[in-house]
Design a protein with these regions (language model features):
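Generic N-terminal amphipathic, Lys/Arg-enriched alpha-helix
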Residues: 1-17
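Long, contiguous secondary-structure blocks with strong helical propensity
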Residues: 4-5, 27-39
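Amphipathic alpha-helical segments within well-ordered protein domains
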Residues: 8, 28, 32, 82-87, ...
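Divalent metal-dependent catalytic cores for phosphoryl transfer on phosphate-bearing substrates
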Residues: 12, 40-154, 158
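A short, charge-rich alpha-helical start-of-domain segment used by transcription regulators
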Residues: 18-23
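Generic structural signal for well-ordered, non-transmembrane alpha-helical segments
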Residues: 25, 92, 181-184
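Short, mixed-charge aromatic SLiMs
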Residues: 51, 55, 105-106, 162-175
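Charged phosphate-binding loop/patch that engages nucleotide di/tri-phosphates or the phosphate backbone
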Residues: 165-191
Length: 191
């Protein structure tokens, strides 16, 4: 499977495709650097490379003109829209990364508390559909927080990523810090 071929099925050459690919390559490089440093975690590096390159494919469906996205969906739904695309492509495992990488994952409680335009599973379901579960999902979600789409060439520090996540509440920032400890031995906390 060649992620760029899949991207090319949905994106024409130009600013949006270039931005998506640059951002996704940065995310993939950081995730792979961490994966290769942590052989004890038995991370599927082939999958990480593919899924990191495809994790934001859904931005084309969203309304975010500042990053050349002229779709109709709210930007918060880019993961859900990307998951739909990748399921149609026969890539359900990659689709889960799309759904679960927004923020530092989003709990159902956060969806309800913030009135986010995301589907909520039935109350009897224990599943958290927008939360990373596997180490690969967590790693890609983590690596993604270091690169914005508006300036993909600028790598954020852990502290800058935490500040960015803290704007949406402390839960996501705390999850991110747990991953920073796991993946990079970071010992700082929320300030």
């Amino acid at each position: 499977m060649h992620p760029l071929e899949i991207i090319d099925r949905y994106y024409e050459a130009g600013s949006l495709r270039d931005l998506l690919v640059k951002h996704s390559q940065c995310v993939a490089q950081r995730a792979l650097r961490i994966a290769f440093a942590h052989t004890e975690l038995a991370i599927d590096t082939d999958f990480v490379r593919e899924a990191a390159l495809l994790h934001d494919i859904g931005i084309i469906c969203c309304d975010a003109p500042s990053i050349h996205c002229y779709g109709t969906e709210p930007y918060i739904r880019h993961g859900v829209m990307g998951a739909q695309i990748l399921r149609r492509e026969g890539l359900p495992r990659h689709a889960r990364v799309c759904e679960r990488h927004t923020g530092a994952g989003i709990t159902v409680a956060e969806v309800l508390r913030q009135n986010l335009p995301l589907a909520v599973p039935q109350p009897t379901t224990a599943d958290e559909p927008y939360m990373p579960v596997t180490v690969e999902e967590k790693l890609i979600c983590y690596a993604d927080k270091f690169y914005s789409k508006s300036h993909p060439e600028r790598e954020k520090t852990i502290e800058q990523a935490v500040r960015s996540l803290s704007k949406f509440g402390g839960d996501g920032a705390a999850r991110f810090l747990d991953w920073a400890s796991l993946f990079e031995g970071y010992g700082g906390g929320l300030s």
